[in-house]
Each structure stands twice: as C-alpha cells, then as structure tokens.
Amino acid sequence: CVLGLAMGTSAAAGYADTNSRITPWISELAFVPIDLSENAAQDEWSGDIGCAVNYFSQQAVSRLIEPSGLKIDPALGKPEKLILVQEAMEAGDDKAAAIYRTIGTYLGYAIPQFARFYDIKHMLLLGRVLTGKGGELIISKAEEVLRDEFPELGKKISLSTPDEKMKRHGQAIAAASLPEI
C-alpha cells in the first residue's frame, strides 16, 4: 500500500492498494484539513483554513520565510522563493533548515491522519519542495515525529523520495508513453 504525495505547486496525491492497483478514489489531499487550530493558514483559493496545500507545497515554504528570519523579497513568486530557500539550505543556512524542519514536523503529524483513511505501508514523497538537502531534512523530521509520537505507525510506514537517477528514469518512461500527435 503506497500513498504518494507530491509537494510542489500544490499537494497532489495518489494511492495504490495492497494489490498494487490505483484506486478509483479521488485522492486529492490538497484541501484535506490537517491543522485544526483557529489560527491555521488560510488557503488563498478555497478560503478554507488548515488545508494540506499550505503545509506541503511552495505555499508552505513561502509562508514560513518571514517567521524563519530568512531575508527574501516578498514580491517574488512562490517558485522563485523556493529556489532561494533551496539555495540557502544547500549553503547551510540554519534559517532555511528551520523551514524544512517545520514542514517535516507538519508531515509527521499529518501522516497519522492520512493513515485513518488509507492503509499505508510506504509513503513516496515527490515534488520540487523535496529537492536537495531540504527534502532530506523534511523526511528525517517526519520520521522522527512518527517514531517519537506515533511509534506503531513509525514502525509500519516507511518514507522515501526517488533519487535523481530514478526521477530521470521516471521522466523517460512518462515521455515514452505519450501518444504521437
């Protein structure tokens, strides 16, 4: 049972069951509430608060820049902000690391909620937010939260992201499967 979560422009998901079949369910996790506090982040599109998209995407990175103390021009677009945060992370900036640790903490606490609806043995994490050292930190922090706060799930659910070689193979397979136009 694999739950895939793409953390990029939004938060997209897909699920394969115990028979390795993709279910016919709509696995749209972007608007699933994961933060039930009154001061949860509000989604700019739906107006809802606490939606996963604000915790596992470029929106999360952008929202966490100011509280981290990282100095990035607020007028930049979310993709550009993400690139600058990634560059800061690769350079060893502790403020950038705080952003990724926070996202990893969010993920660690959200996985048990996802597990209420999906039988998860493996979680495949994808998307641009997971690129580089920041992605590694997100995964390690989420694993730490699972291990410390939800030990049974921590033993049952593994987290991973494909390495660059696997990403390239996946892109080649996808390109080869496209129909001729």
Language-model-derived ranges and their functions:
Residues 26-44:
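Acidic-enriched catalytic cores of C-N bond-cleaving enzymes acting on peptides and small amides
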Residues 3, 18, 38-181:
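ATP-binding/phosphotransfer module of carbohydrate and carboxylate kinases, centering on a glycine-rich
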